[in-house]
Amino acid sequence: MNNLFFSKILRSDNIHFVGIGGVGMGALAEICIKLGYKISGSDIKENLITKKLSVLGAKIYNQHCANNIIESTIIVVSSAIKEDNLEIIYAKKLNIPVVKRAEFLSELMRFKYGIIVSGTHGKTTTTSIISYIYKEAKLFPTYLYGGRLNNSDDYGNLGNSKYWISEADESDNSFLFFRPIISVVTNIEKDHLESYQGNFKKLKESFIKFLHNIPFYGYSVLCLDDIEIKKIIPLINKKIVTYGFNRNSDFCITKFFQSNKKIIFIVYIKHQKRYLKFVSNLLGKHNALNITAAITIAIKEGIKYNIILNSIKKFPGINRRFDFINKYDLSNLNNKKGTITIVDDYGHHPTELKLTIKSVKKIWNKRRLIMIFQPHKYTRTKYLYNYFVKVLSTVDILLIMEIYSAGENPIYKINSKNLCQSIMALKRSHVIFIPNEKFLFKKLELLLKNNDILLLQGAGTIENIFKKLTSKLLL
């Protein structure tokens, strides 16, 4: 890959990433290191990503400070970073360009064969499956996504071919920077409405614009099961390929079976009049849809069937996407006999919660379900409050942690205590407010008993709870 070519495009050698410890930012920084750029970055917490980047040669700062950017010629910012960040303020004073991650990535992809995945749910899983198939097909893609493959530190890599595969985030409308050859939309729901003046119609209009960003020779891959996608299809004047359980889909899932370890499903390929059977370690109908989106692209792009089939079968999954571990010993926690099953899931939108709860109940029917939930963002909790109440009332015992702010300011009356009270009013679940970690572990000591299912759900610091809990309970 010609580093000089990219230098001419970006006119920059020293790139600084604000919020470099995030998965998406870290993956992009790693790719830039491999392209030959001098990389620095700041994040308030050291993690596995910043450690890896440091080993690769990046200069990492564990605080945000104006001095961090003195040698930088371009500043790349995460969508989680606010305008009042010291480094951003100082960069603007020095007339150093400050660009969003999506804008920067879109420039790298400008002359490449881009495949971009968007949608409210399933972006990371779908993107990682597409990337995995392309790797197995020896197409050597560049790829990056917002998660980490299980049993590895793989969340992005620089390839040496024309293919660039990434997910795109609609949270701040920055997905409109991309001009891919192939675009994917998995679904459209109310989320990130704070970026759209609380107006769902404006969010849908942005998705329509995104789908029109492909060239005349490109195409979009859309899930026909999604109500909102079906509504906007007549408004799209570009080539469309559909997938889903819907019988009118171009790639139609005709049969689906799930055990507690895998899913088996059959896809009918309309233009080939052919049925293909797939087996995956991922669970749930929603994952059958994510997989079928990837299958659609792979078949359309001419990848051999046996490579696709084997890739789907081998795909290890993404960290914290319905990870579960059976037989955790209770004796180390509360001196009780027996074991429990622990499920860890990243989902933080009520639809994601609903799907996870449904999958848990289907796999472990009649077992008591105890759920720890950490709401993510005040704005999401505000706009989807009633939906959260409805979904969260379906578990046996619910423990709700404080809202993870993700940098947002508190909103009056939007808090976990009030959410608990609203759920308790339905009188369906036993609900407990969790003010801190110490209180949580004390409650778990009292509550957990043999054969329970413990579900940890959320995108914030709850991941650390899972690590501490499993270190105590693992047989």
From Swiss-Prot:
The gene is murC. It catalyses: UDP-N-acetyl-alpha-D-muramate + L-alanine + ATP = UDP-N-acetyl-alpha-D-muramoyl-L-alanine + ADP + phosphate + H(+). One of its GO terms (molecular function) is UDP-N-acetylmuramate-L-alanine ligase activity. Cell wall formation. Disulfide bonds: none annotated. Pfam families: Mur_ligase, Mur_ligase_C, Mur_ligase_M. It is found in: Cytoplasm. Its EC number is 6.3.2.8. The keyword ATP-binding applies. The keyword tRNA-binding does not apply. GO terms for cellular component: cytoplasm. ATP binds at residues 119-125. NCBIfam families: murC. This is UDP-N-acetylmuramate--L-alanine ligase. Pathway: Cell wall biogenesis; peptidoglycan biosynthesis. Belongs to the MurCDEF family. Keywords: ATP-binding, Cell cycle, Cell division, Cell shape, Cell wall biogenesis/degradation, Cytoplasm, Ligase, Nucleotide-binding, Peptidoglycan synthesis. It comes from the Bacteria. It comes from Wigglesworthia glossinidia brevipalpis. GO terms for biological process: cell division; cell wall organization; peptidoglycan biosynthetic process; regulation of cell shape.
